[in-house]
Regions:
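Catalytic alpha/beta core domains of metabolic enzymes, predominantly
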Residues: 117-242
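Active-site beta->alpha loop and helix N-cap motifs at the rims of alpha/beta catalytic domains
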Residues: 2-145
Length: 242
């Protein structure tokens, strides 16, 4: 398990960031088996020590591609569980999410699937499995209202997916969420955040690398990327540690 969020400053030089950003590699059931297997096989390659601290990939984001069907997604979840990494289950289909949690719940995954239309059912699943629930929405107002509704239902074990339709929107989301929590003391936005760079720069690994660096500073608790080999890890893990 990893501790996320808990930050008290907007800028690192004001004090420090207390809980470092965690990186996740994205897998999707929409991928072919060869691609999935190759990406999973590459995960252990990044594992080294820097200044007495282990540097390795901590998480896997397991995305549900509805067009591939539930069965393939559940098989992918099984493969991801076998890696021993912490999982983020990116699935907003309640029935598929329920089945995925049955497979993965022992490892305490994050269920990133709540939105304005399904949050009640997703909340029930997350509370039953005792896992963190991820909240997304069409815009910040919708996310805010959904988080408030979940809090009213008694769930504060949440994480906010700040990923928007564009880089500009995502950056604004991340900054506004942090500022609302710290400057305005609005605890409805006082949760860790997920930023998915694989959605912001589709199949552009160089842009994704730049965006991972950006959202390490601005204010991703979990940042998702398509791949994180040794060459990509070196320029990210050093600044994150510093």
């Amino acid at each position: 398990e990893y501790t996320l969020g808990g930050e008290t400053v907007l800028y690192r030089h004001e004090k420090t960031y207390v809980n470092k950003t965690r990186y996740a590699v994205s897998l999707c059931s929409c991928m072919d088996d060869a691609t999935i297997d190759a990406k999973i096989a590459a995960i252990p390659a990044v594992d080294y020590e820097r200044i007495g601290e282990r540097m390795h990939l901590e998480m896997i984001y397991v995305n549900y591609g509805a067009e591939a069907g539930a069965d393939k997604y559940l098989e992918l979840v099984k493969k991801a569980v076998a890696t021993g990494k912490t999982l983020v289950l990116g699935c907003d289909d309640v029935e598929v999410a329920k089945a995925a949690l049955e497979i993965a719940k022992a490892g305490k995954p994050i269920l990133n699937g709540a939105n304005a239309s399904n949050y009640e059912a997703m909340n029930a699943l997350a509370k039953e499995a005792d896992v963190v629930l991820g909240v997304s929405g069409a815009n910040l107002d919708e996310i805010y209202d959904t988080v408030a509704a979940l809090e009213k239902a008694g769930n504060k074990n949440l994480i906010i997916d700040a990923t928007g339709a564009s880089l500009k929107e995502t950056y604004a989301n991340a900054v506004q969420i942090r500022r609302a929590a710290l400057k305005d003391q609005d605890r409805t936005f006082g949760y860790p955040t997920i930023v998915n760079t694989s959605k912001l720069a589709v199949k552009d690994k160089y842009m994704q690398e730049a965006l991972v660096s950006l959202f390490t500073m601005k204010y991703g608790s979990i940042v998702v990327v398509d791949e994180l080999g040794y060459a990509e890890a070196l320029p990210l893990f050093g600044p994150r540690q510093n």
